[in-house]
Amino acid sequence: MMFTKSEELLDRALKVIPNGTQTFSKSRTNLPLGASPFYAARAEGARLWDVDGNEYTDFTSGLTAIILGYNDPDVNAAVKEQLECGVIFSLPHKLEIEVSELICEMTGAEMVRFGKNGSDATAGAVRLARAYTGRGHIAQCGYHGWQDWCIGVTGRNLGVPQAVRDLTHTFDYNDIDSLRRLFKDRPNQYAAVIMEPMNKEWPKDGFLHEVRELAHANGALFILDEVITGFRFAVGGAQEHFGIQADLVTYGKAIANGYPLSVVAGKAEIMRRMEDIHFSFTNAGECLSLAAAKACLNKIRREDVPKYLLLLGQDLPGTGHPSWRHLNFAGMEEKTLFLQEMHRRGILCLGTINLNYAHTHKDVEKFWQALQAAREEDLVCEPLKPIFKIR
């Protein structure tokens, strides 16, 4: 398998784009040179073709943003119809109302505001919590985007002032005592607890409910970051899956099958403070993404897409939810070998297996066959270097 055109484009990109791409997870820090495609040409269903013409079964699914499959006909039809009417206007469009109503029906939220990226939504939820409680500190668990408030407590915090870093504190998943210690150290100072409902491991019985109870007992809001789990774990997201309701929830990724849209949703009493804080985007009401979201969410609900993903992913390797499996590597050499050999065998997977509705049992069998064969090979490219840990 040759990557000549990909590497030529990478050389060009590095002259005008820092790291050669707009998204860290798609950069050369995550793809071994000489053994990887760097640029896509097109995609259809669960298939992706790179600029060299190589075909892959794509288990990355646009970093979980593709839930129905690339070029889904229902989403495409909705977007084409809206394109004839317009993309953005000088007034709001009724799609803002229709998609908000749909999200409320599916998730149990009472009010909704839109952003574009997951980071928009999580930052908005945190600002809203601070405004509502009058407090400054945040307890977090998981990955919540690139904004200063959360990235400052990771190893990639260059440019984040210490004063901002000092307001965010991490606790460990499935360790309620680690959260108790945070509240004990700073009583009456926390505005919110924000967390992913799960990523690599399942919550222990009652853990999410314990977190919510502890947050409320200390006067803090309970925020679930469902940017990835939303509409993937169940029609109503992880809240439905685990039988819990948060004060605020953030959504993104799968909500519009790849079109840029994110959401802050929650209880009306809290959400109405959005009228007082500043959370505003020129393109938050952009209509192609809203049309895509309306079609995507209706299809997810109508065809129970999460159930299909759950059943399809039952036998996949790794840890976590069957629709979002996390592969565990002994080190960077093992991960690089995995990428090298899976690419050679026409599998695109960057370390998590992100299923979409276009994947089939045949695709899962192909993944297993490629994985078994990859274990017999040797590394022929330079191993990737460690990067900052986000989960």
Please annotate each region the language model reported.
Residues 1-391:
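Conserved N-terminal phosphate-binding loop of PLP-dependent enzymes in the Aspartate aminotransferase
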